[in-house]
Amino acid sequence: MQRQVLTEQSLYYGDVDMPKDWDIDRDKLSGDILQSVIQNKDFPFSRTWDMLNTYMRDHVGLEYNVNLINKETWGNIYKPAEITIPLLNIDPVDLRNSPDFTLLYGVKVKNCMVRIHYEDNRRKGRSWDIELKDNMFIMFPSTNMYYLTNNQKDSLNFVQTITYEYI
C-alpha cells in the first residue's frame, strides 16, 4: 500500500524572536499604522518594518523551505469590541496575481482573537481560533477567509498585515 499527499495547508505562528538588541520598535510601527490610516495613504517603508519582514521571510525560508517575496503591506486599527467582516486577501477571478500567504503581526494588541476558516475535503465550514498577542505572528494561506475580534473594551488593537507570494 502506498500513500500520496495531494494537498496540505500549513499555518505558521509564534513569537517574533529577534536577536538581542534588535527588537522590533512596535511604537514606531503603531505610529506608522496610525499615520497611514489617518492620511489614507500607503503604509510607509521603515527600517522597523523591514526588520520584521526580513525576519519572517528568512526564518520561514530557513526552517520550512518556504521562500517568499512581498506583495502588499498595510496596517489596521481595530476599535474596542470590534469584529471585522470576513476578510479574504485574494481575488477569486485573478488567482495568478493574488498572494499565496497572509501574515498578521500583533503590533499592539490585547485580547485579540483570529478565526481562520478552512475546508477539510467534504468537511466544509471548519475554523481554527488563535489569540494574536503582542509581538506574535500568524501566517496562513491567503485562500483562507479569516476575521479578527477585539474582545476588550478599553484600547485599540494595531495589527500589521503583509501578503507574500511563494516562489
Identify the function of each model-found stretch.
Residues I69, W74-N144, T149-N151, L156-F158:
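Catalytic core of non-heme Fe(II) oxygenases with the double-stranded beta-helix
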Residues T161-I167:
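Double-stranded beta-helix
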Residues M1-W74, T84:
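Non-heme Fe(II)/2-oxoglutarate
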